[in-house]
Amino acid sequence: MDQQNFYKSKNKLIKLFKADGRWLRIPENKGECVVLSDLHNDGRTLDFIIDTYLVNSKDAKIVICGDYGDRSPSSWLSKPTATLDSLLKLKLKYPDRIFMLMGNHDLNPSKYQNFMPCEFWHSLSEHDEGFYTEILESLPVVTTFENGVIMTHGVLPSSAIFDDFDLASIALMESLWSDYTEDVPVKTDSIRKQKGLDDFKRSMDSFNCNVLIKGHNPYAPLRMFDNKCVTLQTTRVFEGVCGRHIAIVDLGKPVSDVNDIKLVDLGILHGK
């Protein structure tokens, strides 16, 4: 797809993303879904995942839990939008197999919460800034499967009842920016607020789910809360901090805890 046709696809992409509001429900109960998070412009890893799990399967799905730009791996010599562009084009080609959630790096810092690093946003022309802002503002925040798995970027909203497209909502902003922790007491005095076990249980009960798959925090344990929460980082940027993982969910199998999900270490499978 050439650049002009890509620009013309903006309204189609927004319509696809807005179809289910901020809470995307995926009703399928067969096949597999690969879940990843925090690609941060790691196109090499994305290409490997697409080639391995999407192209070679007729019904496999992929969910990405946000943070598509910034922190580009030094060995991925490409423009800051490269990985996001690839995903958006894949969404157009496979609208029922590629699902993208919103991360905190995906909201324009000139309109919402400022943050660093944000080389993705700083690299854009005025036209491109408007193009990506409108598309990324339309992304869902939460995705659920019927087998008890829920996905988000940071933490879950405290209630399953939240405004579909109100980006000024405190609940939505806290979902993108906050972290879960098993530490006590819980810190609440920064943009990256901490949520504890009670918050986690309250949200999981509200959404009627058993296991959360999320991203956002490379310093979080891979498994938390008695095997009810998984934190993924898929980019090579944090390889030495937390490893590089994806989760594979069997959509036809009830999931009661993390042991019912396959966690794959891409550092071992894919190498550097």
What does each model-found stretch correspond to?
Residues F48-Y53, S86-L90, R202-S203:
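A generic secondary-structure signal
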Residues C229-K272:
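Binuclear metal-dependent phosphoesterase catalytic core
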Residues Q3, Y7-K10, M116-D128, E134, ...:
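Active-site-proximal loop/helix segment associated with metal-binding centers of metalloenzymes
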Residues M1-T81:
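N-terminal active-site segment of His-dependent metallophosphoesterases
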Residues K30-E32, K58-K61, Y68-M151, P157-S158, ...:
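Active-site neighborhood of divalent metal-dependent phosphoester bond hydrolases
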